[in-house]
Amino acid sequence: NSNSKFGYSALPYIKAMFPQIPILDYVHMEEWYNKNGGYSRYSAMYESIIDKTLVCNDNSKKILIDYFGKNKEEVETVYIGVDEKTFSAEKYNKEQLKEKYLGIEKNKKVLSYICRISEQKRPMLLLQIIASLKETRQDFKVMVVGEGNLLNKMKENAKKMHIYDDIIFTGNMKNTAEIYAISDVTINCSIKEGLALTSYESLSMGVPVVTADVGGQKELINDNVGKVIKLRQNEKDIYNEIYSNEEVHSYVDGINTILDNTKEYEKKCRQRIIKYFTIDKMIEKMSNILQKTYQGPNEIKIQNGKSLNKNLNICKELITTNLKNDEIEYRWECTEYEKRIYGRAYSMQGMNYKKEILKENLWKIPAWRGFIKILHKIKG
C-alpha cells in the first residue's frame, strides 16, 4: 500500500482473510499539517499487521522510528531513483529546444520550476526569489511547468510584481525532459518533500538543483550538484505566504553561484545519479526486500491476522467508515471549490446545480444582464 487511506483501512480485513501473506507499505514523507503526520501516522497505526515499511529517504525512516515508534528492523530506505536513459541530455538538442521555448530570448539562462502549483510547493516564494534575483541580473527566464489550485493566483501576483514577462507558464507537460534540457538550474522551494522526483530527473540531465532543506533532499543534493537552503518557515504555517528576506536571499545567492559556474556542475550531477540513484539500483534493492519478506513472513503479524479473523465485522466496519468519511470530505471539497469558482455553494441534493451554474455564467455576460433587465421592466 502507498498513499491510500482506503488501502490502509482495508489492510486489517486483508490480513484477517490471508494472514500468511506479508504486507508492505511505502511512505513518501510525513506531513504534520495533515492529521499530524499524514501517511506516516497511518503506517504506524497499522504496524501490527505490516511486515515491512519502505521509505524514500533516511529522514523519513528516522521519523517513523523515533517519533512514531516503528520497529527499526521493519523500516528500510529505498531511494526512488530515475531512469537515467530517458533523462539524458545527450538525447536532446539544447539549441533547437531553446529556440522552441524561448524564441528571440534563446540566449538567456533558464531556471526551471517543475511541480504541482500548490501550497506545499510555495510558488509565491518563487516569485519573491525571481523579483529579488532580477534586481541584480536580467539574463534569465523562468519556466513554470505544472498546474494546481494556486496557478491563477501565481500569475496574478507575477503581474502585480512586474515579473510576469520573465516567466513562461507551460501548464502540465508529459515530456519534462525537454525543459531540463534547456535549463541551467532547477528550483525546489517546497515547505515539505520526501525526496522530489524532479531533483533526480534534473541531476540525471546534468542540471544542478537549488532546494529547500526538507525531507531527504540533502541525501541527494550536496554542494557538488547544487545548493541546499535552510527552511525558515514552520511547516504548520504552510498557508502563510510571508517569507523571510533571509530565506529569499539565500535562494538568490545559491542560484547566482550556480549560474556563474554552470559547467562545473553539469558532469558531477550526472555522475552522482549514475553512481547511486539509477532506477535499476532501486529495482534491485526493492526486489531483494520483496523476495526476503515473502520467503520469511513475520510470525507475529501472522498471528495478529488470525486474531483479526475472529473480529471480521470490525474490519469491515473500518472500511465502511473510511468510505463514508471520504464521501464527507469529497462533499466539503466540492462546496469549497464552488465557493471559490462561482462565489456560492450549490447543494448536491435537491437542486439542479448545472442549471444554476449556467445561470451564473450567463449573468457574467453584459448583454445577458441587459436583456434580463429589459424583461423585468416589461413585466413590471
Map each language-model feature to its residues.
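Short His-centered aromatic/hydrophobic patch
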Residues: N1-G7, V27
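A short, active-site helix/loop in glycosyltransferases that binds the activated sugar's phosphate group
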Residues: S48-V75, V82-T86
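Conserved donor-binding/catalytic core segment of Leloir-type glycosyltransferases
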Residues: L54, I104-K121, L127-I130
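A short helix/loop element that forms part of the nucleotide-sugar donor recognition site in Leloir-type
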Residues: S88-I104
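Nucleotide-activated donor-binding/catalytic signature segment of Leloir-type glycosyltransferases, i.e.
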Residues: K155-G171
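Aromatic "clamp/platform" in nucleotide-sugar-dependent glycosyltransferases that forms part
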Residues: N172, I191
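Short hydrophobic beta-strand element within catalytic cores of glycosyltransferases
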Residues: P208-T211, I221, V228
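A short, well-ordered alpha-helix in the C-terminal region of glycosyltransferases
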Residues: T257, K263-Y276
